[in-house]
Amino acid sequence: MRQSSTLTWTSVLLAPLAASKGLIADYASCQSACVSLSSQLSVESVGNYIAEFEQQPIAGAGVEAGSLYWSQQQQALRPACLVHAREAQDVALVVQTSRSTGCPFAVRGGGHSDIPGFSNSHGGITVNMAGLGDVKVDASAGVARIGAGAKWGAVFKELDKTNKTVVGGRLTGVGVGGLLLGGGLSHLSGLHGLACDNVRNYEIVLANGSIFDVSHSTHPDLYRALRGGGNNFGVVTRFDLDLYDQGPMWGGLHVWPLLPSVTSAITSAFAEFGHEAPSDKHVSLFAGLGFMQGNFAWAVGQYDTLGREEPPIFSKFRDDAETYGAPKLVKTARVTSLSDLAEELNLSEPAGMRSRFTTATFRMDVDLLQLMAGYFVEEVERALENGLREDKRFAPMLGIQPLTKNILRAQSKRGGNVMGLDEESGPLIVCSFGWEWFRETDDAVVIAGIKSVLEKSVAAAKEKGLYHPFKYMNYAAEDQDPIASYGAENVEFLKKVRHTYDSDGLFMKLVPGGHKI
């Protein structure tokens, strides 16, 4: 009775706020849903989210040490109740309760999306999957069974003990579920493709509350749809991933100051790598032009899964004062574990900030990369002049990552994914325009700056015949439609699969977060 009273109080307190924002169609349905859940799950499984939220620090060194959600925009939302799922049956009960009451819900895996409502429900039910975070290694079967509530840091720490790994994320604080359902760029993608292409089996809760194991052999249509189709078909509670041998890796960050000579050298080396990468599948690379603590700088991440220091394919990124015109400011490259490399990258994205990402894809071209760098600097300087100079935590970034032919070729395994890319499309540049700031009052300035960089870059690419319609789901903004970018044939396939497994459209209507079909 006490727990039910607490949940009722939370819903009543929330009702005026939710109604004013138009985010709840019927708050009474969610009050009913929360009371019903509290009577069927243990007291520990349903929490007073407002009380729990107040106990969380707003800003920390990273997601693990800070808030429930990585971005302020998600953390600010208030669900009617928070369900702490411990097993797939708990998730099934939430789905059934949502269906019977009409109360919307959201699923929090790692909580790393910056888009409000993607993994937190304002006025509805939020399912916290952290209790479904087990990592079980079956070396004899060549598979790692990973709960959907795990984060990649915990996954890699467990796998490091076995000298095995999986194709997964690159930051410790990113959740397993979101990354795998949206694609997943990895240090191992050159060898094995995107992370989603290395899922052997999904345990999923469907719209009717049933729990199924889905693989290429059991449900080939749903299996393919889940490889890039997002959260449109059910709630995945476990991912069974292909297991690979992995010893110590070489890798780290290389940082230069922003100079015309540095921009020229890095963009040229990046484009050359994009074309040459198929000759060495054991390496991976990304680059970014950023602004932090008053300075612009280029950062390049270089990685080798064999542990080779400075492999030849990275020769153009070595210190060369004549080419770069400046020495490196930072070099962290070393031979270490995959979990250590993931922790290093996680430190670059502290929790508790406001954040916005958007994305675009272009064909590999040096001149376009240099134009984009110019657009980025121009818009950041404009934002600084319009109040962001006062925000010492303002950290915009233009990120570029190669989708090489070998990565694209590996997508075809087990029937392929739904993203509409093939080897002949490459090499491509996947861009992430990701800006972080602290004050809500600066939202308009920041969003205008991001939009301008994106629009100018797209316009330049189209003029040069370098534009590609693909939008990578894991970097896409709320107002972008990555699924439409997969092409008409794949969209029709996804609609058919959705109708087969969710004919009433529960995951379209009652799970408003996520990119929809």
Curated annotation (Swiss-Prot):
Keywords: FAD, Flavoprotein, Glycoprotein, Oxidoreductase, Signal. Disulfide bonds: none annotated. Fusaproliferin shows cytotoxicity against pancreatic cancer cell lines and provides a new chemical scaffold that can be further developed to obtain more potent synthetic agents against pancreatic cancer. Fusaproliferin and its analogs show also anti-inflammatory activity and can be hit compounds for the treatment of inflammation-associated diseases. Pathway: Secondary metabolite biosynthesis; terpenoid biosynthesis. InterPro entries: FAD-bd_PCMH, FAD-bd_PCMH-like_sf, FAD-bd_PCMH_sub1, FAD-bd_PCMH_sub2, FAD-linked_Oxidoreductase, Oxid_FAD_bind_N. The modification Pros-8alpha-FAD histidine is found at H112. Its EC number is 1.-.-.-. GO terms for molecular function: FAD binding; oxidoreductase activity. Its cofactor is FAD. Disruption phenotype: Leads to complete loss of terpestacin and fusaproliferin production and accumulates oxo-preterpestacin I. Residues 1-19 form the signal peptide. It is an enzyme of class 1 (oxidoreductase). Glycans are attached at N163, N208, N346. Residues 75-246 form the FAD-binding PCMH-type domain. FAD-dependent monooxygenase; part of the gene cluster that mediates the biosynthesis of the mycotoxin fusaproliferin (FUP) that belongs to the class of bicyclic sesterterpenoids. The product of FUP1, preterpestacin I, might also serve as a substrate of FUP4 to yield oxo-preterpestacin I. This is FAD-dependent monooxygenase FUP4. The gene is FUP4.
